């Protein structure tokens, strides 16, 4: 049914999930990519979406007959192409919305409880971001661990800011970057518990995690998860339990791919990197499989979400995206501002300074392009953010930093930042 690119160097097939698979090609020209797109049309697949980000090209084609979709990406700077064939699922709309009385768009970094590592007396993990859009609805990004304080911090914030929207309950789109417990644990509890879930209306859940077949040794194959095993213990169980909760809650699920555009209330969300782009480079850690996306609000102000992105992901961004894409007003500091979990000594980084593990070139790039607000999902008192390490970070990322000791809210019109009480 589907022809594939015949020229260029092809990697082994990559089993993603849900009967989905990917071919990755190097040495592909734009003409060869165009020929492949034509072959999809010749096979009577219908075009659902096309997108360009800088010099990169993306397309989604669907076959109702076979219940399949084909997502294709071409990265011009590196002459690489990705072909992903998967079951036909939810397809996002990129259309804007007429809103008569738009609300001021905001972006909040919530103060949350964190896991304490008794060995070094530091607190690690967890992040929750909440964007409120012109229509009053919310986009939540990730979640903290399954602590009561985190649950009430999130639900109370949503309910307090739902006033005046006209909605009976907060309207939520929930996007996840990767499957570590400090990013999905709280969400899993809310989704699985009717009492908590009924306090909000979940319109869409969006994620793209590794397949179990691709987990590798870095997934601790134990039966416990979330807070019972620490931040990262039992990641395999964590993802399985999260996906079971997603299925049980009955919400619409969207498996995004790079180049996809999801528009909600005139906020444009572009997915820039997934684990499908990093392949065939090996995943040394779950963080290396995470997603990066950019939110451009109706005001034109933008937010770059890095999750726990590693230096490999940072290099992919620098190698494949132009200045217009990387120019943002607000950035989420990757991996809670801490050092990388990647095997930097096996990569091309200078390991003499731990901060180099996070590719300071990316932070310098966004700073040079005018980024003015840095949201760091960690406590300012953590010693791993202090001293020369903190100085090194600030020398590259020169924006004003805000930590989640308190809940900070960014006005996405003026970029003014205020504490939420």
Model-derived segments and their meaning:
Residues 1-24, 84, 90-92:
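Compositionally biased P/S/T/G-rich terminal and signal peptide-adjacent segments
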Residues 27-49:
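Amphipathic alpha-helical segments
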Residues 89-169, 247, 255-326, 411-421:
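Core dinuclear metal-dependent hydrolase active-site scaffold
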Residues 125, 147-148, 179-185, 212-215, ...:
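Active-site environment of divalent metal-dependent phosphoester hydrolases
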Residues 130, 138-142, 171-177, 203-208, ...:
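Structural recognition of the beta-strand scaffold that forms the well-ordered cores
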Residues 148-207, 320-340:
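Active-site metal-binding motif and surrounding structural segment of the metallo-beta-lactamase
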Residues 184-197, 215-225, 343-347, 385-391:
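Metal-dependent catalytic neighborhoods of phosphoester/phosphodiester hydrolases
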Residues 204, 210-268, 284-285, 367-421:
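Binuclear metal-ion centers of metallo-dependent hydrolases, dominated by the metallo-beta-lactamase
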């Amino acid at each position: 049914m589907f022809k594939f690119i015949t020229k260029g160097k092809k990697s082994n097939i990559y089993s993603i999930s849900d009967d989905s698979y990917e071919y990755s090609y190097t040495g592909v020209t734009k003409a060869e990519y165009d020929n492949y797109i034509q072959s999809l049309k010749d096979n009577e697949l219908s075009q659902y979406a096309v997108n360009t980000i800088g010099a990169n090209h993306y397309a989604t084609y669907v076959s109702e007959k076979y219940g399949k979709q084909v997502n294709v990406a071409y990265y011009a700077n590196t002459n690489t192409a990705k072909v992903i064939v998967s079951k036909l699922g939810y397809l996002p709309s990129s259309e804007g919305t007429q809103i008569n009385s738009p609300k001021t768009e905001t972006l909040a970094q919530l103060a949350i409880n964190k896991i304490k590592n008794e060995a070094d007396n530091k607190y690690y993990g967890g992040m929750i971001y909440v964007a409120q859009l012109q229509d009053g609805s919310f986009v939540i990004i990730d979640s903290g661990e399954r602590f009561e304080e985190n649950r009430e911090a999130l639900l109370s914030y949503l309910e307090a800011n739902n006033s005046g929207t006209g909605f009976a309950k907060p309207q939520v789109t929930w996007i996840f970057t990767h499957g570590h417990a400090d990013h999905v644990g709280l969400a899993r509890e809310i989704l699985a518990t009717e009492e908590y879930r009924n306090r909000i209306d979940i319109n869409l859940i969006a994620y793209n995690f590794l397949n179990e077949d691709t987990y590798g040794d870095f997934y601790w194959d134990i039966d416990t998860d979330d807070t019972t095993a620490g931040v990262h213990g039992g990641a395999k169980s964590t993802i399985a339990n999260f996906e079971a909760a997603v299925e049980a809650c009955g919400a619409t699920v969207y498996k995004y791919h790079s180049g996809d555009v999801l528009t909600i209330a005139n906020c444009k969300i572009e997915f820039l990197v997934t684990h499908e782009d990093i392949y065939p480079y090996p995943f040394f850690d779950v963080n290396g499989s995470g997603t990066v996306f950019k939110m451009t609000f109706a005001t034109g102000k933008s937010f770059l979400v890095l999750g726990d992105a590693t230096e490999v992901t940072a290099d992919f961004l620098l190698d494949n995206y132009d200045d217009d894409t990387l120019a943002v007003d607000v950035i989420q500091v990757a991996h809670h501002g801490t050092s990388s979990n990647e095997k930097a000594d096996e990569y091309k980084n200078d390991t003499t300074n731990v901060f180099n593990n996070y590719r300071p070139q990316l932070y310098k790039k966004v700073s040079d392009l005018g980024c003015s607000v840095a949201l760091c999902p960690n406590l300012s008192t953590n010693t791993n953010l202090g001293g020369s390490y903190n100085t090194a970070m600030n020398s590259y990322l020169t924006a004003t930093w805000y930590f989640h000791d308190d809940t900070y809210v960014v006005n996405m019109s003026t970029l003014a930042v205020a504490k939420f009480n």
